[in-house]
Amino acid sequence: MTAMTPGSNLPLSAVRVAVDVTAPVRLDVSGLLLAADGKVRSDDDFVFYNQPAGSGVTHSAAAGGGDTITVDTAAVPDGIEKIVVTASLDQPGATFAGTEPTGTVRNADDNSVLASFTPPQLGAETALVVVEIYRRSGAWKVRAVGQGYANGLAGIATDFGVSVEEPAAPAAAPQAPPAPPAPAAPAGQWGPPAGTPA
C-alpha cells in the first residue's frame, strides 16, 4: 500500500477500484465523471446517495461506515477523462477543522488496498476533492488532490458543471391590501355643527 501526498499519483493495477472516504464524523461521498473540459456532460454524471449509478461509476453506503465510490474503468465511456471523488460534511455548519478524512483506494475485486490519502491542514473547508481517477495515455491512474471548498458540495458541483438548485427563499407574508380611505364626515356629524366656531 502506498501512502500518497497531495499531487502524487500512481498507476492503477486493477480494472475495478473502490474509493472509501472515512472520518470520525459522517461524510457524504460522491463521484463526478468529467469530460476533457473538466465538466460533467450532464447532471447524470454526478453520482451520489440520491443518484447511485452513472456510466461505470457507482455509489454505495456501508451500514455504520463510510460511503464508497466504485469505478469500473472498463465501463467508463471514452469521453470521460477523470472521475473526481469528493467528500462533504453531513452536519450543517461543520467544517473539516480538526477532522482528518482518509481516502482509501482498493482493488474492488479482491479488496486489497492500493493507496491511501489523508489531506493535510484542513480548516474552514466544508467539502473537498479527495482523489481523482484519471485516464492518461490509455492507462488509468489515481491522484491525491485534497482541494477544499468553503461552500460545501454545492460549490464543488457548480465548479464541475452540475446544475445546483438554490434553496427557495422563504416566501414573504402576503401584505394586506391598504385599508380604503374613510369617507369624509358630513358637516355637523361627529363634531360641532357647521358654521359653529370651534
Q: Which role fits each region the language model picked out?
A:
Residues M1-A198:
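Intrinsic-disorder/low-complexity signal
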